[in-house]
């Protein structure tokens, strides 16, 4: 994607990874880096030498992942789009989430929010475990490894080989969850329906938010 490629180039401009490359080579390296973080796992530059800003930006791309219908990991681009569109609808005071002149199904919106929240909760739990087991490692590197695992990306900041067995177990669990978790959760939330809800209508209650 053009935007992510441009942002990646900005964050990596001072990196040792592409600092000596020509302008055209920098664009190619940045473009490939923004694409490979979606799930490809190939690296043309050293991930360990990326700056903290570049690694953080890479974590965002890895967490979002690619589009549905393929082998890409992450929460998927459509799920992230639903989340952003829902936020926009709330800000604009609209009752439903809209996109290109269509109203998105409420089941899609609820499933998308659930997928993002559950995936983030599992990722955060795994990252916390890594931080506890690896107190001497840089937190941004642990975050990069955890996000790459749950996003089934395959990139590494050259940290995984030196981790303890407990950390390896955490990363393996994140990989399994990332591979089957979001897809399975989407199918479960989309296909499961509470039969009792059809015959009851509970009173509405408003609570304070924010």
What positions do the PLM features span?
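Membrane-proximal intracellular helices of multi-pass ion channels
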Residues: 8-210
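Positively charged, low-complexity/disordered segments
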Residues: 1-7
């Amino acid at each position: 994607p053009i935007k992510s490629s441009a942002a990646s180039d900005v964050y990596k401009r001072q990196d040792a990874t592409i600092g000596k490359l020509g302008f055209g080579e920098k664009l190619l390296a940045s473009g490939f880096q923004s694409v490979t973080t979606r799930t490809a796992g190939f690296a043309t530059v050293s991930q360990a030498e990326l700056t903290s800003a570049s690694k953080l930006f890479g974590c965002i791309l890895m967490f979002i992942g690619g589009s549905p219908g393929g082998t890409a990991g992450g929460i998927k681009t459509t799920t992230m789009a639903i989340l952003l569109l829902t936020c926009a609808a709330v800000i604009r005071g609209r009752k439903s989430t809209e996109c290109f002149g269509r109203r998105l199904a409420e089941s899609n919106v609820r499933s998308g929010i659930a997928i993002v929240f559950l995936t983030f909760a599992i990722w955060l739990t795994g990252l916390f475990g890594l931080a506890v087991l690896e107190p001497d490692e840089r937190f941004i590197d642990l975050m990069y490894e955890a996000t790459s695992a749950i996003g089934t990306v395959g990139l590494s900041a050259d940290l995984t080989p030196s981790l303890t067995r407990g950390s390896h177990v955490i990363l393996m669990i994140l990989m399994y969850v990332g591979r089957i978790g979001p897809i399975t959760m989407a199918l479960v939330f989309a296909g499961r329906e509470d039969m009792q809800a059809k015959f009851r209508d509970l009173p509405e209650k408003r609570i304070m938010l924010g």
